[in-house]
Amino acid sequence: MGKASANNVKSDKEAAKPAAKKDENKDFQYIVRIANKDLNGERPIPLALSDLKGIGLRLGYAIAERLNLQPTKKIGELKEDEIEKLKEYVENKEYDLPDWLLNHRREPVTGKNLNLVTTDLDVQVQEDINLMKKIRSYKGIRHEKGKKVRGQRTRSNGRRGLSIGVVRKKE
């Protein structure tokens, strides 16, 4: 009889644990929306931010440190005001971080160092390519022709299109 009552006590304790855990997670958000993208609330702040195009893991850690947030804390555990502060900081293009950490340094029109995210980054990259094409720079011409831009080999690699096989010299 003693064993049966001990088992009942254990099962009662185990049953109480999940209920307590659910009570702790009342404010937990499983999806957090930042910069028009849904982020997984179960991931730590830097990892969740790295899901945004234009923010890597290192920048995610830097943003968490700048806003005095624990990098190990899950993004879904943040309070509403902390999430708003994070949204505002990420969507702001001018970060108060070192220049080498940003993805669009010395912007041609204003000369400022920016970090662009999501569609802003896509649009800016396309504008930069169009500017190179317009001014007929070497990189712009390579972009127009669909060739490799960054100095890679083209003789034996990256073949696509109509050519079939290797062209041999006639003897």
From Swiss-Prot:
Residues 1-22, 142-171 are annotated as: Disordered. It comes from the Archaea. One of its GO terms (molecular function) is structural constituent of ribosome. The keyword RNA-binding applies. One of its GO terms (cellular component) is small ribosomal subunit. It holds the Pfam family Ribosomal_S13. Keywords: Ribonucleoprotein, Ribosomal protein, RNA-binding, rRNA-binding. GO terms for biological process: translation. SUPFAM superfamilies: S13-like H2TH domain. The keyword S-adenosyl-L-methionine does not apply. InterPro entries: Rbsml_uS13_C, Ribosomal_uS13, Ribosomal_uS13-like_H2TH, Ribosomal_uS13_archaeal, Ribosomal_uS13_CS. Residues 10-22 have a biased composition (Basic and acidic residues). Residues 142-158 have a biased composition (Basic residues). Part of the 30S ribosomal subunit. Forms a loose heterodimer with protein S19. Forms two bridges to the 50S subunit in the 70S ribosome. Located at the top of the head of the 30S subunit, it contacts several helices of the 16S rRNA. In the 70S ribosome it contacts the 23S rRNA (bridge B1a) and protein L5 of the 50S subunit (bridge B1b), connecting the 2 subunits; these bridges are implicated in subunit movement. PANTHER family: 30S RIBOSOMAL PROTEIN S13/40S RIBOSOMAL PROTEIN S18, SMALL RIBOSOMAL SUBUNIT PROTEIN US13. Belongs to the universal ribosomal protein uS13 family. This is Small ribosomal subunit protein uS13. It comes from Thermoplasma volcanium (strain ATCC 51530 / DSM 4299 / JCM 9571 / NBRC 15438 / GSS1).
